[in-house]
């Protein structure tokens, strides 16, 4: 690759689009004649406010976000939102969660600190290899919201059809599939996403929340920074935000617009994932771990059936210039994360390497 870069299959932080990195490099020492790098700017300056405004406007255009939704750029990652969602949205102290993998499981554990959590469906029985049927969930009338992790980064499952919430608010953690395909924001009460997987550098989460869900009658013990009202009333500027992440993400939003938006990005992601899944389906050594109907386009876990051989594959791929293919420590195996910025050439090169590895080890 150009600049001696590697195909980085990390689950996050992950690859960013090369044209974006080049533009950031070119603006590093003197951003648009300001005489300083964005990392050096006051977040209260006019030049930085323009960066924030452009980033929000471009994201709104990309996702066609309705006017009655707020866009917030908040420090920290998705894990902080496990608590923030429950603390801000549990007006009646009750929420329904769907357990589909490691991240929804962690969100459930955190939400239980703030109210009653009903796990209405789970795929734990088959090691989170599918999405349970959520067409007729048992949802109490006084439920504040229904929560899903729309793409489970570790287990590699994704929702192809949203749950029937029976009129209740839907909250979705989209961290590992954010901006990977078109999204009808009106289907959700709230979307949030840690940006380090599919958008920019680590340390920030994007929150898209319907205005009527931003409450004033919140627990007075809640840290003021975790209040969505605090963030919304101050335009994500209650304190110094993650200025660098906002800037970098703004560049990615513009890049996505330039290539044809989320429809085009979705087509590319389908093509990329197909290269790897087609190989896994015919391989005698490597096997995918997710039922085909629920396979993620972003995170592709697979195994050889032998922990020792899995480790050998990881070592061999790293030596060949394909980084971060080791599966998450909680599940083992292997995992290829092919987020937006991964070119299809990366998927093709990985498959060719795995074919060669398989041939050499099955003689």
Model-derived features: positions:
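Active-site phosphate-binding strand-loop segment of PLP-dependent enzymes
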Residues: 12, 111, 123-178
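Active-site C-terminal subdomain of aminotransferase-like
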Residues: 195-277, 291, 360-363
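PLP-dependent enzyme catalytic core of the Aspartate aminotransferase-like
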Residues: 1, 6, 319, 332-363
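PLP-dependent aminotransferase-like
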Residues: 79-146
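Conserved active-site segment immediately N-terminal to the catalytic lysine
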Residues: 171, 185-196, 205
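Conserved PLP-binding catalytic core of the aspartate aminotransferase-like
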Residues: 286-317
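Conserved N-terminal alpha-helix of the aminotransferase class I/II PLP-enzyme fold
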Residues: 34-81, 88, 102, 110
């Amino acid at each position: 690759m150009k600049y001696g870069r590697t195909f980085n299959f990390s689950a996050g932080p992950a690859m960013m689009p090369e044209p974006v990195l080049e533009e950031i490099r070119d603006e590093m020492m003197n951003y648009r004649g300001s005489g300083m790098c964005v990392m050096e700017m006051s977040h209260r300056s006019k030049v930085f406010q323009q960066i924030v405004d452009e980033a929000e406007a471009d994201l709104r255009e990309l996702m066609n976000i309705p006017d009655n939704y707020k866009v917030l750029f908040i420090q920290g990652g998705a894990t902080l939102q496990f608590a923030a969602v429950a603390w801000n949205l549990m007006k009646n102290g009750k929420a329904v969660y769907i357990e589909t993998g490691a991240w929804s499981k962690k969100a459930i554990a955190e939400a239980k600190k703030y109210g009653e959590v009903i796990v209405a469906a789970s795929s734990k029985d088959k090691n989170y290899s599918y999405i349970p049927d959520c067409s007729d969930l048992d949802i109490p009338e006084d439920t504040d919201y229904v929560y899903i992790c729309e793409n489970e980064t570790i287990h590699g499952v994704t929702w192809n059809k949203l749950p029937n919430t029976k009129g209740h608010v839907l909250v979705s953690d989209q961290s590992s599939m954010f901006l990977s395909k078109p999204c009808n924001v009106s289907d959700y009460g709230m979307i949030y996403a840690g940006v380090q997987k599919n958008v920019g550098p680590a340390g920030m989460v994007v929150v898209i929340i319907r205005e009527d869900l931003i409450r004033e009658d919140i627990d007075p013990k809640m840290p003021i920074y975790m209040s969505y009202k605090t963030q919304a009333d101050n335009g994500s500027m209650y304190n110094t935000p993650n200025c660098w992440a906002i800037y970098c993400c703004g560049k990615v939003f513009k890049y996505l617009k330039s290539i044809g938006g989320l429809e085009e990005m979705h087509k590319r992601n389908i093509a990329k994932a197909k290269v790897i899944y087609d190989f896994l389906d015919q391989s005698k050594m490597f096997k995918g771990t997710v039922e085909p109907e629920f396979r993620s386009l972003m995170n592709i876990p697979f195994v050889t059936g032998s922990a020792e051989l899995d480790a050998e594959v990881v070592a061999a791929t790293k030596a060949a210039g394909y980084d971060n293919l080791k599966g998450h420590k909680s599940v083992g195996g292997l995992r290829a994360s092919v987020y937006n910025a991964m070119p299809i050439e990366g998927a093709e090169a990985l498959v060719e390497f795995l074919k060669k590895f398989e041939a050499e080890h099955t003689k």
